[in-house]
From Swiss-Prot:
During catalysis, the active site Cys acts as a nucleophile attacking the alpha-carbonyl group of tRNA-bound glutamate with the formation of a thioester intermediate between enzyme and glutamate, and the concomitant release of tRNA(Glu). The thioester intermediate is finally reduced by direct hydride transfer from NADPH, to form the product GSA. It catalyses: (S)-4-amino-5-oxopentanoate + tRNA(Glu) + NADP(+) = L-glutamyl-tRNA(Glu) + NADPH + H(+). SUPFAM superfamilies: Glutamyl tRNA-reductase catalytic, N-terminal domain, Glutamyl tRNA-reductase dimerization domain, NAD(P)-binding Rossmann-fold domains. The lineage of its organism: Bacteria, Pseudomonadati, Pseudomonadota, Betaproteobacteria, Neisseriales. NADP(+) binds at G184, A185, G186, E187, M188, I189. GO terms for molecular function: glutamyl-tRNA reductase activity; NADP binding. GO terms for biological process: protoporphyrinogen IX biosynthetic process from glutamate. This is Glutamyl-tRNA reductase. Homodimer. Substrate binds at T49, C50, N51, R52, S104, E109, P110, Q111, Q115. Pathway: Porphyrin-containing compound metabolism; protoporphyrin-IX biosynthesis; 5-aminolevulinate from L-glutamyl-tRNA(Glu): step 1/2. The keyword NADP applies. PANTHER family: GLUTAMYL-TRNA REDUCTASE. The gene is hemA.
């Protein structure tokens, strides 16, 4: 089985497909353990973010696709058009590019590197990684660090979090006059909330499944932040001008009916809603309502392109560095794969040497001259070492040109 990757991202699949193939954080340990113990793969890492789901494996790509479809109870033909399947070298290149932010919606964004590290940590905890994936991701983190240190690819990047504030400012002139509701209390919400907090909104509320986690985030945000439970949403939604949601829920949290009731109470005041979750937290039909401005991760593309031109120049240098590191890694791995063969070859040579030497000692004991023994020894050793390759070449026909070329290279006969 070889190193391979199967996946889809914001470039190959719309949100409606990506959300069907996303892995919830709570399910990820069981999923990666299951994959690494299936007939599809012997090693596995699953990366699942709002913009991509990727399975890095040592395995069979067709079986991995079948496993992915079965896991999500989807027909293969429904997901296949959106998937990419990568061979060994392209898997290495892709992993390096993703970690460097070169494949991100926001060119050079740093958050993806942390997400890859989290995915690797989960895989390690589930013992689903072996020598090949460990080597790949150790090199991936090293390359990402070098690219981000030696190039300007990540400078001036507009993050999804900062873009959220920019988008809200297009609808409301002053964030300071707004009540902002955050649904969820994970990493993405914390990043977005931090940007909003810098604009000093009138009120910030964090709604979460557990009050303790909501309170923890409120404590970080400042005095004008308060916690509440998700179950409170129907009663309080109308009080907020901005709603940002990003949870790990597999089902929508905010439905069209809930928003309709909130809009009636708001009396035509606009409600800005940003759904950064995959799968989506807010029903898509909410976008059809008057005075409800619903945006998803796919709607953020134009906003996050700010400063992209300057970063693209830096990206060219980053791509060159990535290509060099890919070639270096592939050479190292191919060298390691040859080690057992080299050992076996040397063992065979040593075996032949001992046999010929034993014969020579017997001849000397019988009174043969040293010259005769050395002559016979050299002929026997030559015959033993060349017997197997000579036999193989005699059997090889014209169609086996690769073998003939390989032998010519090994013995430097192609000059």
């Amino acid at each position: 089985m070889q190193l391979t990757a199967v996946g889809l991202n914001h470039q190959t699949a719309p949100l409606s497909i990506r959300e069907k193939l996303a892995f919830a954080a709570a399910c990820l340990p069981e999923a990666v353990r299951n994959l690494a113990r299936s007939n599809a793969a012997t090693e596995a890492v699953i990366l699942s973010t709002c913009n991509r789901t990727e399975l890095y494996c040592v395995g069979d790509s067709e079986e991995i696709i079948r496993w992915l479809a079965d896991y999500h109870s989807l027909p293969i033909e429904e997901i296949s058009p959106y998937l990419y399947t990568l061979g060994m070298q392209e898997t290495v290149r892709h992993a390096f590019r993703v970690a460097c932010g070169l494949d991100s919606m926001v060119l050079g964004e740093p958050q993806i590197l942390g997400q890859i590290k989290d995915a690797v940590r989960v895989a390690q905890e589930q013992e689903s990684m072996g020598k090949k994936l460990n080597a790949l991701f150790q090199k991936t983190f090293s390359v990402a660090k070098e690219v981000r240190t030696d190039t300007a690819v990540g400078e001036n990047s507009v993050s999804m979090a900062s873009a959220s504030v920019k988008l809200a400012e297009q609808i409301f002139p002053d964030i300071g006059d707004l009540n902002v509701l955050f649904i969820g209390a994970g990493e993405m919400i914390e990043l977005v909330a931090t940007y909003f907090a810098a604009k000093s909104p009138r009120l910030m509320t964090v709604a979460n499944r557990t009050l303790a986690r909501a309170q923890e985030l409120c404590d970080k945000l400042g005095v004008n932040a308060e916690p509440c439970l998700l179950s409170d949403l129907p009663a309080i939604l109308h009080e907020y001008d901005v709603v940002v949601s990003s949870t790990a829920s597999q089902l929508p949290i905010v439905g069209k009916g809930m928003v309709e009731r909130a809009l009636k109470q708001r009396q035509s005041m606009p409600l800005f809603m940003l759904d950064l979750a995959v799968p989506r937290d807010i029903e898509a039909e909410v976008g059809d309502l008057n005075d409800a401005y619903l945006y998803t991760v796919d709607d953020m593309v134009n906003i996050v392109q700010s400063g992209k031109e300057a970063r693209q120049k830096a990206a060219a240098a980053a791509e060159t560095l990535v290509s060099e590191k890919v070639a270096e890694f592939v050479r190292q791995q191919q060298g390691r794969q040859s080690v057992p063969l080299i050992r076996a070859l040397r063992d065979e040579g040593e075996k032949a040497r001992k046999q010929v030497l034993e014969n020579a000692m017997k001849q000397l004991a019988k009174g043969a001259t040293a010259e005769e023994v050395l002559e016979r020894l050299s002929i026997q050793l030559t015959n033993k070492l060349l017997h197997s390759p000579t036999q193989t070449l005699n059997k090889a026909g014209e169609e086996d040109k690769d073998l003939v070329h390989a032998v010519a290279q090994i013995y430097h006969l192609d000059k």
